[in-house]
């Protein structure tokens, strides 16, 4: 079972066992000790976002939703391992960028539009900017990152912007 995870993640067997222990700790009444007995268990988002690695993150719900196959934010062990794998230090920039894009695309239209940027900014600044400041920042981001001039950021625009952010890889990660 664990070899399968080793093949498609950035983890070794020890890491995967540690992740299973963490998953079990989140909901011991739901998750069996021996995962092979009941592999499709969904741990609710409300428990996942209480993890120390996510608790203070302003995007915790969006992060969990991005990895949730059921679309409700509930995670299976597969989803949980995927989340930690993408957010680990070993994951490549393009993989991290694709999930970051999903997280910031609040309206799920496959673009990061002005409204998505406003929601992102509100979370990052804890709504401390006034409306004019928010509009100014969002306009500036679109002006600088919108390569094709359509008034929104497609994935290529976003990826180009991320490539210019040297701290992206070091900030878009969590440790197990």
UniProtKB/Swiss-Prot annotation:
Positions of Ca(2+) 1 binding: 105, 107, 109, 116
Keyword tags: Calcium, Cell membrane, Cell projection, Cytoplasm, Magnesium, Membrane, Metal-binding, Repeat
CDD domains: EFh
Compartments in which it is found: Cytoplasm; Cell projection, Stereocilium; Photoreceptor inner segment; Cell projection, Cilium, Photoreceptor outer segment
Transmembrane segments: none
A GO BP entry: calcium ion homeostasis
Entry protein name: Calcium and integrin-binding family member 2
Organism: Ovis aries (Sheep)
Taxonomy of the source species: Eukaryota, Metazoa, Chordata, Craniata, Vertebrata
